[in-house]
């Protein structure tokens, strides 16, 4: 099942639990606007290249739409639509005043030079500048994009609308980015894990972890969990997978990786088959890479007691059912990986106020938002006698539905 079908399925289940009428249900599912633009740029060798860019603005009942822009060869309208819808529910679960959006350009960023990426970003911004804005739609980095991409968008947008730092989040600190933003998703994963384990009388300290993905989210999650006394016993990325039953030395591994080393070449670990990573014995499994990695083929062999969805849609619905029968507790993506969008909200607030926070305040506020969201999800689980995924979906959908009704948009 693709990401759009799975997200829509979860939404419909939540709508049924909430007893939404069919007209309201349909209006919540339909995107506010879908944008498709062609971006033609001169390449460094003088030839012209064309790329298709997308922006799906899903819902703005609770505030400006919010969502990342990804550069990836497999960006397509279905995927962007699913992720935009997911952002609507995610921002509502987090109780931040945003709706959902998502965008992307179908390209292979690794095959483009820095100057080509800049030209592509500026052309894309020129095509959508009148449809985004601090109080309309606020983009952020995603797969294949970063703070430099956001700096180019900010600059290009400002040529049309004047200096507007709040138009994007995930910017460089020197252009109004927030302290703590780089670590935010990984730190939020740690806070979410801490909250879930506490419910079961456990803690990060003394628990064993397997992490799939060692990019921004995975590396920060591993580092912060290690600092909290958790034992990361296996870890993998596109270069390979490694394990150490006594716990990997995460600071040493980070140093090795930052010096250009591949995971499989790390001295203090045993190389393992990557296909074994997700089914490795552990207390907590944290998928931080692509969607759909847990499926009906490998779900029966999963040995983790808890799964924290740091990636978007890492668990197929079929795997969800298998894991539930096995008694595995899954903390869903629309809550578990919301640390990034929460700190993006803090960045937006700081830009609008023109008053920057120190990192301690950012982390303290993030902790508060993650804890509050978890308690609200648990309350919905109790009210509707459902699992954590449906607890999160009913919480998010209910908040958006209430805002829609209050604004008189249901007709």
UniProtKB/Swiss-Prot annotation:
An example Gene Ontology molecular-function term: glutamate dehydrogenase (NADP+) activity
Gene3D superfamilies xref list: Leucine Dehydrogenase, chain A, domain 1, NAD(P)-binding Rossmann-like Domain
GO cellular component labels: mitochondrion
Main subcellular location: mitochondrion
Location relative to the cell: Mitochondrion
GO biological process terms on file: cellular response to nitrogen starvation; glutamate catabolic process; response to alkaline pH; response to cold; response to nitrogen compound; response to salt stress
Residue span of the annotated presequence: 1-18
Catalytic activity field: L-glutamate + NAD(+) + H2O = 2-oxoglutarate + NH4(+) + NADH + H(+); L-glutamate + NADP(+) + H2O = 2-oxoglutarate + NH4(+) + NADPH + H(+)
Tissue specificity note: Expressed in roots. Expressed ubiquitously in various tissues.
SMART domains found in the cross-reference section: ELFV_dehydrog (SM00839)
Matching Pfam families: ELFV_dehydrog (PF00208), ELFV_dehydrog_N (PF02812)
EC number assigned by the record: 1.4.1.3
Active-site residues (renumbered): 102
Induction or repression: Slightly induced by NH(4)Cl and NH(4)NO(3). Induced in shoots after nitrogen (N-deprivation) deprivation. In roots, first transiently repressed but later induced by N-deprivation. Induced by alkali stress. Up-regulated by salt stress in old leaves. Activated by IDD10 in the presence of NH(4)+ ions. Induced by cold stress (i.e. 10 degrees Celsius).
InterPro entries, A to Z: Aminoacid_DH-like_N_sf, Glu/Leu/Phe/Val/Trp_DH, Glu/Leu/Phe/Val/Trp_DH_C, Glu/Leu/Phe/Val/Trp_DH_dimer, Glu_DH, NAD(P)-bd_dom_sf, NAD_bind_Glu_DH
Disulfide bonds, paired cysteine numbers: none
Entry annotated with the keyword Nucleotidyltransferase: no
Assigned keywords, A-Z: Mitochondrion, NAD, NADP, Oxidoreductase, Transit peptide
PANTHER family found in the cross-reference section: GLUTAMATE DEHYDROGENASE, NAD-SPECIFIC GLUTAMATE DEHYDROGENASE
Family of this protein: Belongs to the Glu/Leu/Phe/Val dehydrogenases family.
Protein known as: Glutamate dehydrogenase 2, mitochondrial
